[in-house]
Amino acid sequence: LMRDKVMANDICKDLIINSQTEYEKPGIINMFNNNWKGKADIVNHEEKLVIDLKTTADIDKFQWSASKFNYDSQAYIYSKLFGYEFLFIVIDKNTHQIGMFDCSPQFYERGEEKVRKASEAYDLFYKTKDFDPKQYFISKTL
C-alpha cells in the first residue's frame, strides 16, 4: 500500500506522527473581505508545518500539477489559516516514489494573487447589486 511506503520513510513518519500533530484540522479566515475555509491533512506544531498528502500519476510532473490544480492557492490559504509554512508530501501512484515539496515565496505569491482574483470575482458575482452574469465576459489581447 502507498500508505505503508510513506510510513516506512523515517522522515515522513516523523513529520506525520508525533505528540504535537493534529489531523484534519479545520479553519476559517477572512482574506480580501471574504471568508475562506480549509481542512489541513496534518498540522505539525513541533516542526511548524502544515502538511498536505497528495498522490500523483507522475512525480516528475508534480510541479506542473501544483500550478494546474491551484495548489499554490491552497498553500497560501492554509499558511495564513494556521500560521505555518506548507509542505506537500507526494507519492507516485505507479512507482511509489515519495517526494517532499516545500513552497517558495514566489509559489505563495502566485497563490495570493489567485485568491485575490477569486475574491474579486466572487464580489462581482455575489456582492454587486443588480449584476447580470449573462453580461459578463473576459477580454484579452493575444
Model feature map: region roles:
Residues 22, 70, 94:
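Electrostatic, structured charged patches in enzyme active sites and in nucleic-acid/phosphate-binding
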Residues 64-67, 77-142:
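Metal-dependent nuclease catalytic regions and adjoining charged, substrate-binding loops involved
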Residues 34-35, 69-71:
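Short, glycine/acidic-rich beta->alpha junctions
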Residues 1-39, 135-142:
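Metal-dependent nuclease catalytic cores that hydrolyze phosphodiester bonds in DNA/RNA
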Residues 38-63, 78:
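Conserved catalytic cores of phosphodiester-cleaving nucleases, focusing on short active-site segments
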Residues 33-37, 44-48, 84, 95-96:
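Coil-to-beta-strand transition motifs
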Residues 28, 56-58, 93-95:
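Short, solvent-exposed loop/turn segments at secondary-structure junctions
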